[in-house]
Amino acid sequence: AGEDHGRGPYVQADLAYAYEHITHDYPEQTGTKKDKISTVSDYFRNIRTHSIHPRVSVGYDFGGWRIAADYARYRKWNDNKYSVDIKELENKNQNKRDLKTENQENGTFHAVSSLGLSAVYDFKLNDKFKPYIGARVAYGHVRHSIDSTKKTTKFLTSSYGGLNPTVYTEENTQNAHHQSNSIRRVGLGVIAGVGFDITPKLTLDTGYRYHYWGRLENTRFKTHEASLGVRYRF
């Protein structure tokens, strides 16, 4: 917009809705790493969550191409899960043996920050609407932790003589898995959206971006984001 065809530095503020997909690879209970048995359930191996976060950008508009640096912080995800299962092992002569299995899991995941650099091309359909596409490279900081405990208790319930049943604990075992990482990695993404010029200097922007943060040791993280914001050109 304008006689200079939109050239000049600009700032942009967005509010983004992000779909976050986190995949963890923990030791399996069989195979070459069976000496490092993980009690982590599938619930914490494959996390899908959502968050809303702000994003700010500073860039330069060349009249068709735009280059911008952006910064965003994401909401911390945390959850816990407790489950218990009782399995009957034996029942004869008024004596019953059961195995009680308890699982307690606590997990957190936080995309602490993302600092990106993007190159975007605007398609000028008319004086107001400008669809765009682009690519983005970003330096991301991610933290995640898991604390998982599996406890088994074998107990005997005796009803001999018709009296009130008596419960005897026979055996206890406990396995635990603890892990905490703070990782930084460079990832790649794509950008698309539409800009609407409210004034020659002010643009309403609605956009989508996909970003693959890369394999962060035993974790893979990717986000799909839809955003709405305003861009002001100086």
UniProtKB/Swiss-Prot annotation:
It holds the Pfam family Opacity. The keyword Membrane applies. Residues 1 form the signal peptide. One of its GO terms (molecular function) is porin activity. One of its GO terms (cellular component) is cell outer membrane. Its main location: membrane. It comes from the Bacteria. The keyword Membrane applies. Transmembrane segments: none annotated. Implicated in a number of adherence functions. OPA proteins are implicated in pathogenesis and are subject to phase variation. Belongs to the opacity porin family. This is Opacity protein opA55. It comes from Neisseria gonorrhoeae. The lineage of its organism: Bacteria, Pseudomonadati, Pseudomonadota, Betaproteobacteria, Neisseriales.
